Amino acid sequence: MSSITETFGVRIDATNSLVQAAIYGFLLAGVAAFAAPIVSTIRVLLSLFVLPGKSLSSFGPRGTWALITGASDGIGKEFALALAAKGYNLILVSRTQSKLDSLAADISSKYGPKISTKTLAMDFAQNKDSDYNNLKKLVDGLDVSILINNVGLSHSIPVPFAETPKQEMTDIIMINCMATLRVTQLLTPGMISRKRGLILTMASFGGFFPTPLLATYSGSKAFLQQWSSALGSELEPHGVHVQCVQSHLITTAMSKIRKPSALVPNPKQFVKATLSKLGRSGGAQNVAFTSTPYWSHGIMQWFLSRFLGERSPIVVKINRGMHEDIRRRALRKAERDAKKQ
């Protein structure tokens, strides 16, 4: 009888222990669930407003070279001006030679012989081996420590995928994806050998949040996001930092927005935020080798990702409605313009 009592005693003690463990587990889970959004909020605010980014010089000293694609206008031009001000020589690549010459002349007049510039007119949509061979000749022997993958193309107006012109689809993929791959692959061996370097690739909310009526563009930018996260892990052991830079709307020719606001910075404001937050995630929390550095874009991405989910049906539906409206207005404008002619 005593042995049975002892046995039952052990069982009762064991049961009590299991109950206590379960209670503690539920309590800890509750505390974690309550604390997680608070911690996440603190993290995003610190990253966007308080903590500084890494210094550019940690990726390559002044006097080394920065290569910028899509350099003649908008964001690319502002990157060129900002990097020249910080003492970096420039390789400017874009489609129109006259615009490149004008930018190079502006930089030369401001900084004189302290900053060297090289230019190459190149239509990335053509994907010509001869163009990439010319680019390779241009950079051979140069210490290129910074690469800004900025060249990009979107649809002329929002358009259903079934109606997207074949040439437009091809150009978007060639410019956004293939050009970025080929230029990066051309420069990474040198960065690896020098054990330092910075690769910034301009992405878009259109790739982070699925965007109906911009399906090809959205897919191309989603590709850049996945590729950057994978490439960043590959190059990190070699001292090369990769950062996919996410953004919402900016006052550029691509967005067709002219007036800046709190939600829509101009290129200069966006570039300043990007270079001041190198290595910081901003609103792109828990996304490897990715940053959303501009404050309003960062808060927007963080909120949507945390509380709705970047690929949730609600977000996709909102995106579709917004771009259907943009398409209707664009078509009406085209009709009015046609009647005036």
Curated annotation (Swiss-Prot):
NADP(+) binds at residues 67, 123, 131, 150, 217, 221, 250, 252. Keywords: Endoplasmic reticulum, Fatty acid biosynthesis, Fatty acid metabolism, Lipid biosynthesis, Lipid metabolism, Membrane, NADP, Oxidoreductase, Transmembrane, Transmembrane helix. It is an enzyme of class 1 (oxidoreductase). Pathway: Lipid metabolism; fatty acid biosynthesis. GO terms for molecular function: ketoreductase activity; very-long-chain 3-oxoacyl-CoA reductase activity. It is found in: Endoplasmic reticulum membrane. The chain crosses the membrane at residues 22-42. It is a single-pass membrane protein. It catalyses: a very-long-chain (3R)-3-hydroxyacyl-CoA + NADP(+) = a very-long-chain 3-oxoacyl-CoA + NADPH + H(+). The keyword Endoplasmic reticulum applies. Its EC number is 1.1.1.330. InterPro entries: 3_ketoreductase_fungal, NAD(P)-bd_dom_sf, Sc_DH/Rdtase_CS, SDR_fam. The keyword Cell membrane does not apply. GO terms for cellular component: endoplasmic reticulum; endoplasmic reticulum membrane. The active site is at residues 217, 221. Pfam families: adh_short. GO terms for biological process: fatty acid elongation; sphingolipid biosynthetic process; very long-chain fatty acid biosynthetic process. Coiled coil: none annotated. Component of the microsomal membrane bound fatty acid elongation system, which produces the 26-carbon very long-chain fatty acids (VLCFA) from palmitate. Catalyzes the reduction of the 3-ketoacyl-CoA intermediate that is formed in each cycle of fatty acid elongation. VLCFAs serve as precursors for ceramide and sphingolipids. Belongs to the short-chain dehydrogenases/reductases (SDR) family. This is Very-long-chain 3-oxoacyl-CoA reductase. The lineage of its organism: Eukaryota, Fungi, Dikarya, Ascomycota, Pezizomycotina.
